Structures are given as structure tokens and as C-alpha cells.
Design a protein with these regions (language model features):
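...captures the hydrophobic TM-helix bundle architecture rather than a specific catalytic motif
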Residues: 1-224
Length: 224
């Protein structure tokens, strides 16, 4: 079963890598491939769309390459365990899927779904040995700290929608020049809207990458 997991990841990486290299190499235009409706609430609607362009292709290749190495190492590491590790590899595959969803997203809502999927998979992997109190405590700490940071992240996405009336990358990026001088007043001080948005998104990234003040979960996560 472990060998099949590693082999499956190798085949997936090679197939997707070949397809993406062809996509990039032939210089095809940026485009999204809609797969399914993701959210439809009132007048708000967004689809699950895979977007391919130079940056996303690079990130997909990076995610698959690192994930392949992690899967290969995990196959060797978990082979010494007496109990089957099906649950572990399911969590690891979920992490890879969420990361791919994140880097291939076409809008901020899909990015957020992938973002939260990565957080969920991290929580499950850190707490895999649920019979160990240290691992369980580390998983809870990671989950709580990341949710605090994610609150800033989702508020940033909400503010983007309020300002630009869209979460689509193309629409938002095209409208940025017109919003450069837009300001909100906070405590009597005018602050540029884009600065607020960037700050909120940055705090969200700080939590996920365990940067200053939002890093305590990372050392504890090693217990998992």
C-alpha cells in the first residue's frame, strides 16, 4: 500500500508536470478552466476554476515536486510502523490537493478554500498521533493561531469585494490603479484602502508561515 502511494504520486507529478510544461512552453494565453459552481448566494456567484499562467504553473510544479519528495520520505518513514498509516497518507494527499487548489485558483474565494484546506490538513497531520497529549495540544495550538490569522485574511478579502465589487483576479488587478488614492478614516486618520487590504492579507500570511508573533505553533507542531 505504501509503495502504491509513492508510485501514484510519482505518476501524478510526471503527468501533470508534462501537461503544464506543454501549457507554458507553447505560450498559450492566460485562461481559466471552469470545473463547477463553488458559491452561489444572492447576487454573488463564483466558480471553481483552474487558472494556468506562468506563475501558477511554476507554483503547481513546485508543490508537486515537494509533495513527491514528502510522499517518498513518508513511505519509508511510516513503513516502520506496526499499524497501517492509511489515515496519514489520506491527510497528506488532502494537504497536496488543498495546496494545488490554492495556487491554481482564479479568484480569492477559491484561494481561501484552498488556504483553509491547508490549515485543516496541517491540523490533522500535527495531531495524527492523537493518543499523545503533546501532539494533540500542538494540533489545537496550530489550529487556533492560524484561525486568528485567517480572520484578518478573510476580512481583507471582504474589503477587496467591498472596494472592487469582485473577487476575480483580473477584475481586481485591473481596477487597482483607480483605487490607489482611495482612503478610509480610522480614528480620525485617513488611511489608504490598499494599505489596509495589504496589511490584512499580510497578517494572514504571517500566521500560515509562522512569522513573528504568530510563530508559537510551529515549534510545538514538531511534537506531532
Amino acid at each position: 500500500a505504501y509503495a502504491a502511494t509513492g508510485l501514484g504520486m510519482c505518476v501524478t507529478t510526471l503527468c501533470v508536470g508534462n501537461a503544464l510544461c506543454g501549457e507554458w512552453g507553447y505560450g498559450l494565453p492566460q485562461r481559466g478552466e471552469p470545473l463547477a459552481e463553488l458559491v452561489h448566494a444572492g447576487g454573488f456567484e463564483t466558480t471553481w476554476t483552474l487558472r494556468f499562467f506562468a506563475l501558477s504553473v511554476t507554483m503547481v510544479a513546485m508543490v508537486l515536486s515537494v509533495s513527491l519528495l514528502v510522499h517518498v520520505y513518508s513511505v519509508w518513514y511510516m513503513s516502520h510502523e506496526t499499524m497501517p498509516a492509511y489515515r496519514f497518507f489520506a491527510y497528506l494527499s488532502l494537504f497536496t490537493f488543498a495546496m494545488l487548489m490554492l495556487v491554481s485558483s482564479n479568484d480569492l474565494v477559491q484561494l481561501f478554500f484552498g488556504w483553509e484546506g491547508v490549515g485543516l490538513a496541517s491540523y490533522l497531520l500535527i495531531g495524527y498521533w492523537y493518543d499523545r497529549p503533546a501532539a494533540t495540544a500542538a494540533a489545537i495550538k496550530a489550529f487556533v493561531v492560524n484561525r486568528v490569522a485567517d480572520l484578518f485574511f478573510i476580512v481583507g478579502i471582504g474589503l477587496i469585494y467591498v472596494v472592487f465589487h469582485s473577487v476575480q483576479y483580473d477584475v481586481v488587478f485591473a481596477a487597482v490603479p483607480q483605487a490607489l488614492m482611495a482612503t478610509y478614516t480610522l480614528c480620525g486618520v485617513p488611511v489608504r484602502v490598499l494599505e489596509i487590504i495589504c496589511f490584512l492579507l499580510f497578517v494572514g500570511a504571517m500566521g500560515k508561515s509562522a512569522q513573528l508573533f504568530l510563530h508559537p505553533w510551529l515549534p510545538a507542531a514538531l511534537a506531532g
